[in-house]
Each structure stands twice: as C-alpha cells, then as structure tokens.
C-alpha cells in the first residue's frame, strides 16, 4: 500500500493503479472525498518493510515514532543523515558497491540520485584503474525540480550550493580517504542532472576508448554519442513509452569525453528520481528476502527492462 499525507490527485492515481491508500489517523477527514483503505498507523502494524519517502529529516522522526517500536524494516531516502544524533542508519546503499552489506540490516539509507549516479560511474573506474587514479573532481549540475513537480516555480537563476553533502555521502561507502572533490550548482531545468567528472591519473591517462570500454557491459549505464541536450533523452523515453519517461540509468555523453595528459574528463546525465527507484527495489530484496546480488538484479531487470532500454538508447543515439 501507499501512505499519503496530502489529499491531491495522486490519491486517485494510486487507487486506479490498484494500490491501497492509507492516511494519517488525525487527517482522515481531509480525505473524505477519496476511497481510502484506512490509517497509516494500522497499516504499519501489518507491514514487513517501509520505504520512507517523506521530506528530509522527517524520516528520522518516523523511525523513532513508528518503525522502531514495531520492529519494521525501513528504507530511507537521500534527504536523511547517516552521521550524528539524527542518523537513520550507518549504511548508505549503492547496489554496485555494498549490496551484501544491506543483508540483515533493519534500517538503511538509499543514496540520493546524484550520489547513486556518482557511485555507478566511480565503481567501474575504481575497479579497473584503482592503483593509478590520483583524484576525482566532480561538478554536479543539478536540475531544479522533477518533471512531475509542475506546481513548483523554477526561478531564472543559477543557485550555488555551499558544502554539498554528495561527496561525503559517496565517501561513506568508498572510504573517508577517497580523493573525491565535489562542487554543485542548481540550474533552472527539470531535464535531468548533469555531472562533469575529471579523473586524474598518476602519469599518462588511459585512452578515451579504454574508458568507454569499461562501461560497455555495465548494467544501468548507456553510452550515447549524438545527444545534443538532456531533453533529447527524455523525449526519446516518452516516444517509446518508458514508464514516467524514465530511463532508470546513467547516460555517458561519449562525444564529450576528453583526454588531456594525466586527466580524463567524462560528462554524463543522471535520470534523477528514475535512477533511485530500481535501487530501492534492489535494497528491499537484500533486506526483506536476503537475495543474492545476482538474484535481486534479475528480478529488478524484469520490472524495469533496463537492458532493453540501454539497447534502444545506444542504438538511437549511436555514433554518426
């Protein structure tokens, strides 16, 4: 079922898709025009696992108020903390990096879309070139709002993000001494995040072809050559009726990859919320069913068809 706090059109959308909708007991009167199935509190009593998608900071309150007392397995989203007195967990999940660490855990935080995307690119680089990499410098160009957030005004400005959390979040699963430096800005668009990553090597950097080759068979990463802008990808996803226009993956803009002496520059776009949803499915299979990584990935592929999406994207945006 789905927990809903605000009485809006999303309630009927969920019901139409066959979900039971539960609302806070104190707010039930506000939902009198909807066919709700009961209150959230009673639904939690019958739940094995909760995916908490509440605003940042509320997840920790929910953990203390609802989940711990009921001994419910809980997954929290990127707005929460893994350090300090308000930490929801000591594990930030990225299926490519630490899938097995989530098995047996009761409370785990799923990384944000930007953190998930960085991990998906960094892990293959680290696996193939770990001993020769000197440092990673990443500029996050973040979208302002998601596609479905049509009510949110997008201002005519570029917002500067001081001390972004993304770098420390990534270091939580790669190690505190990881030579990763992150800066972030927010731009007025709904059409995906874009990351510009400079990878510095000890000595001469690998060739551009060598870099592209390591991502060729990576799950959830498409290598595209002829994209002019991120909206091209979203429009293609809509044309092919991908659910919610999501590709669920990272798109390396291969025509933008460059090598200069000891440095490789990679540019890739990140499917914002679309990249995190399959990760949540991977995580719940680790926590609830203790599946192997291979088993969880196989089931997730059945749901999201990411291999076929990758094939279609790479074919449409192939090298001219």
Regions picked out by a protein language model, each given a short descriptive name:
Residues 118-125, 170, 280-284:
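Buried hydrophobic packing segments
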Residues 61, 119, 208-209, 277:
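Conserved strand-to-helix beginnings and helix N-cap segments that scaffold or border functional pockets
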Residues 245-320:
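NAD(P)-dependent Rossmann-like dehydrogenase/reductase catalytic/cofactor-binding core
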Residues 1-40, 132-142, 146-270:
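C-terminal substrate-binding/catalytic lobe of Rossmann-fold NAD(P)-dependent oxidoreductases
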Residues 124-128, 200, 286:
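Active-site catalytic microenvironments for nucleophilic, acid-base chemistry
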Residues 116, 203-206, 275:
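A generic structural signal for alpha-helix starts
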Residues 1-148, 295-299:
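N-terminal Rossmann-like NAD(P) cofactor-binding subdomain of oxidoreductases
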Residues 69-71, 130-134, 176-179, 221-223, ...:
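Structural alpha-beta junctions
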């Amino acid at each position: 079922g789905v927990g809903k706090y605000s009485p809006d059109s999303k309630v009927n959308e969920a019901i139409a898709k066959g979900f039971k909708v539960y609302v806070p007991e104190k707010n039930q009167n506000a939902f009198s025009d909807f066919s709700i199935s009961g209150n959230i509190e009673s639904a939690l009593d019958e739940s094995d696992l909760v995916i908490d998608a509440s605003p940042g900071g509320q997840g920790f309150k929910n953990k203390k108020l609802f989940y711990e007392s009921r001994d419910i397995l809980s997954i929290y989203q990127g707005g929460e903390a893994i350090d300090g007195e308000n930490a929801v967990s000591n594990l930030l999940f990225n299926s490519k990096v630490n899938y097995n660490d989530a098995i047996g855990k009761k409370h785990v935080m799923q990384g944000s879309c930007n953190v998930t995307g960085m991990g998906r690119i960094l892990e293959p680089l680290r696996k193939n070139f770990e001993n020769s990499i000197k440092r990673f410098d990443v500029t996050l160009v973040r979208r302002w709002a998601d596609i479905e957030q049509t009510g949110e005004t997008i201002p005519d400005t570029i917002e500067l993000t001081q001390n972004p959390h993304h770098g420390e979040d990534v270091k939580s699963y790669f190690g505190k001494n990881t030579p990763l430096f992150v800066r972030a800005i927010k731009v007025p668009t709904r059409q995906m995040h874009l990351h510009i990553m400079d990878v510095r090597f000890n000595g001469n950097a690998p060739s551009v072809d060598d870099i592209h080759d390591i991502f060729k068979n990576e799950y959830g990463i498409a290598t595209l050559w002829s994209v002019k802008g991120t909206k091209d990808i979203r429009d293609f996803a809509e044309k092919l009726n991908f659910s919610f226009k999501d590709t669920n993956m990272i798109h390396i803009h291969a025509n933008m990859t460059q090598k200069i002496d000891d440095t490789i520059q990679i540019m890739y776009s990140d499917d914002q919320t679309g990249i995190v949803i399959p990760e949540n499915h991977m995580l719940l299979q680790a926590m609830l069913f203790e599946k192997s990584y291979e088993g969880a990935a196989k089931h997730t592929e059945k749901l999201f068809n990411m291999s076929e999406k990758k094939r279609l994207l790479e074919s449409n945006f192939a090298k001219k």
